């Protein structure tokens, strides 16, 4: 699966301790069902929390939100604090202002996390390979998105967002430079976003780095397995 998919990867991290927490929090989701489009509710855009059904992006968002939320004295976390962190992760600068305020493109999602101080761009610091974004997929395929299909206004807003992203330079790690046993600067719990060659799109999949038996694997919500799993083969 990953041999075909992983043309290149973008890696982000939280912190040394945060990475350990990301992995342990991610492992708790193993076997949770994979369900797409859980955020596409009717009515005005609002924060959706559904930890019982996840896709590759919402899995990472829920795990990251839990990791960023301090534990209470009893070892649990505050539901309101979790929701606040989730909103900061999922929406541009943490503000809900309609469908297009949600960070649909992962490059935008990463930039938001770096800008707001809860993510670090590891590939930006460690990999010299770069490319310029060319983003247009959502506005070019509005029929695939419930909130775009019958809303020229949302399509126009999305096109402006895509134009603001296009031309920006990103760092990435080519598949040929990613050995099966990983790299010293990719740590357990790092977020790995796998790029795609689909025109107008930046990322096809994402998950959480996990080293096992000296191999770099991924904790991810798999559309093939229909649940959260640890990948059976290395990312290389």
Indicate residue ranges for each PLM-predicted region.
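Short alpha-helix capping/helix-loop boundary micro-motifs
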Residues: 171-182, 196
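Acidic/His-rich structured neighborhood in mature extracellular/periplasmic domains
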Residues: 34-168, 187, 193, 211, ...
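C-terminal soluble interaction/assembly domains
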Residues: 192-236
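Short, surface-exposed secondary-structure edge patches
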Residues: 181-185, 201
């Amino acid at each position: 699966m990953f041999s075909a998919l992983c043309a290149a990867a973008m890696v982000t991290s939280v912190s040394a301790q945060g990475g350990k927490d990301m992995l342990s929090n991610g492992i708790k989701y193993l076997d949770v069902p994979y369900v797409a489009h859980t955020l596409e509710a009717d009515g005005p855009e609002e924060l959706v929390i559904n930890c019982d059904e996840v896709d590759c992006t919402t899995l990472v968002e829920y795990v990251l939100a839990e990791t960023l939320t301090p534990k209470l004295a009893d070892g649990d976390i505050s539901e309101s604090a979790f929701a606040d962190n989730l909103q900061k992760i999922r929406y541009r600068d943490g503000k809900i202002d309609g469908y297009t305020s949600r960070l649909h493109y992962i490059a935008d999602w990463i930039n938001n996390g770096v800008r707001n101080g809860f993510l670090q761009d590891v590939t930006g610091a460690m990999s010299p390979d770069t490319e310029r974004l060319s983003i247009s997929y959502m506005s070019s395929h509005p029929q695939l998105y419930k909130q775009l299909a019958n809303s020229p206004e949302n399509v126009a807003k999305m096109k402006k967002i895509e134009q603001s992203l296009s031309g920006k330079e990103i760092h990435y790690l080519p598949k040929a430079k990613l050995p099966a046993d990983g790299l010293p600067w990719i740590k357990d719990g790092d977020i790995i976003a796998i790029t795609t060659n689909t025109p107008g799109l930046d990322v096809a999949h994402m998950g959480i780095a996990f080293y096992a038996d000296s191999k770099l694997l991924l904790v991810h919500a798999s559309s093939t397995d229909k649940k959260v799993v640890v990948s059976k083969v290395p990312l290389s």
